[in-house]
């Protein structure tokens, strides 16, 4: 059994806990590698165990941080590696374990007392080319000039779904429905569902509303504006695009895999949504 460790880089408590996890696994005889960026912020790991995140080839990743740490893992790893997520963030919609339960959770993982929670992702094509990371939460198309709306049409499976004048458009997975899409007026979607949410950002007029479509759908977005736009993936990756670009979003063949110890969705999600607001 081989483990990878990734920690939130700006929080000393997360880095120290990462080292304790590393030491625990090494003492118990497991092979462990550590993310290079984690090591650079806390250089106490054995240097021979340090590799770049995009080279991880392990059975499990222990992620110590918040949702941002998980998104970094998902954007950089090349394989769908199950993630045990330890919450060192704020709300931690994606995380599973509180820091005080870290070693109890590791023992359960080692004993095989867990299940894999698979989450869909979406893939983006820019003029037919896939050059950006898959999104676990959302793809956002945003105005490149604050205060200036963008004009676009979007099609679902070839049919015109809406023509929108807005600050942008969010295409979200169920996992991302508690994030940017919810701020745009979208609903909470149970993460077990195979659907995609499309939500305009501050549309004019307000007759353009969020819609939920089958996960198998293809969304084609065509710009009718003459100004630059910004493409944002999970709030982590950004690219400026010319006004005549065509963007296509589909469900990715890849999935995010989380280590879970309970199949309970409620009340965890509803409580955290209320905490957020």
Swiss-Prot record:
Organism: Pyrococcus horikoshii (strain ATCC 700860 / DSM 12428 / JCM 9974 / NBRC 100139 / OT-3)
Keyword Ribonucleoprotein belongs to the record: no
GO cellular component, one term: cytoplasm
Temperature remarks: Extremely high thermostability. Upon heating at 95 degrees Celsius for 10 minutes the kinase activity is not lost, but about 80% of the activity is lost upon incubation at 100 degrees Celsius for 10 minutes.
GO molecular function: ATP binding; metal ion binding; NAD binding; NAD+ kinase activity
Xref: HAMAP family: NAD_kinase
Cofactor entry: a divalent metal cation
Protein's name in the database: NAD kinase
Catalysis performed (reactions): NAD(+) + ATP = ADP + NADP(+) + H(+)
Role noted for this protein: Involved in the regulation of the intracellular balance of NAD and NADP, and is a key enzyme in the biosynthesis of NADP. Catalyzes specifically the phosphorylation on 2'-hydroxyl of the adenosine moiety of NAD to yield NADP. It can use ATP and other nucleoside triphosphates (GTP,UTP) as well as inorganic polyphosphate (poly(P)) as a source of phosphorus. NAD is the preferred substrate for the kinase, but NADH can also be used as phosphoryl acceptor.
Documented EC number(s): 2.7.1.23
Family, per entry: Belongs to the NAD kinase family.
Pfam families for the chain: NAD_kinase, NAD_kinase_C
Binding site for NAD(+): 67-68, 72, 137-138, 148, 165, 167, 175, 178-183, 236
Subcellular location(s) per record: Cytoplasm
PANTHER family for this protein: BIFUNCTIONAL NADP PHOSPHATASE_NAD KINASE, NAD KINASE
InterPro entries on file: ATP-NAD_kinase_N, ATP-NAD_kinase_PpnK-typ_C, NAD/diacylglycerol_kinase_sf, NADK
Entry annotation: catalytic residues: 67
Biological process terms in GO annotation: NAD metabolic process; NADP biosynthetic process
pH effects: Optimum pH is 6.8. At 70 degrees Celsius for 60 minutes, the enzyme does not lose activity in a pH range of 4.0 to 10.5.
Subunit and interaction comment: Homotetramer.
């Amino acid at each position: 059994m081989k483990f990878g460790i990734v920690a939130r880089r700006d929080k000393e408590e997360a880095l120290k806990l990462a080292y304790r996890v590393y030491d625990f696994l090494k003492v118990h005889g497991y092979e462990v590698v550590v993310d290079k960026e984690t090591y650079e912020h806390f250089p106490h790991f054995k240097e021979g165990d340090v590799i770049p995140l995009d080279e991880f080839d392990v059975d499990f990743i222990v992620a110590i941080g918040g949702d941002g740490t998980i998104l970094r893992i998902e954007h950089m790893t090349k394989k769908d590696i199950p993630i045990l997520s330890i919450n060192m963030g704020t709300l931690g919609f994606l995380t599973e374990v509180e820091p005080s339960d870290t070693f109890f959770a590791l023992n359960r993982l080692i004993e095989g007392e867990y299940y894999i929670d698979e989450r869909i992702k979406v893939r983006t094509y820019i003029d037919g080319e896939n050059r950006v990371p898959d999104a676990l939460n959302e793809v956002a198309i945003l105005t490149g000039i604050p205060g200036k709306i963008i004009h676009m049409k979007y099609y679902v499976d070839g049919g015109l779904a809406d023509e929108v004048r807005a600050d942008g458009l969010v295409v979200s997975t169920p996992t991302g429905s508690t994030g940017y899409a919810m701020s745009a007026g979208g609903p909470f979607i149970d993460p077990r569902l195979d659907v995609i949410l499309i939500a305009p950002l501050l549309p004019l007029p307000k007759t353009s509303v969020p819609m939920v479509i089958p996960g198998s759908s293809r969304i084609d977005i065509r710009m009718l504006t003459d100004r630059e736009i910004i493409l944002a993936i999970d709030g982590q990756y950004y690219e400026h695009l010319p006004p005549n670009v065509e963007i296509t979003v589909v469900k990715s063949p890849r999935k995010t895999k989380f280590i879970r110890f309970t199949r309970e969705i409620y009340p965890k999600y509803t409580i955290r949504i209320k905490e957020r607001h």
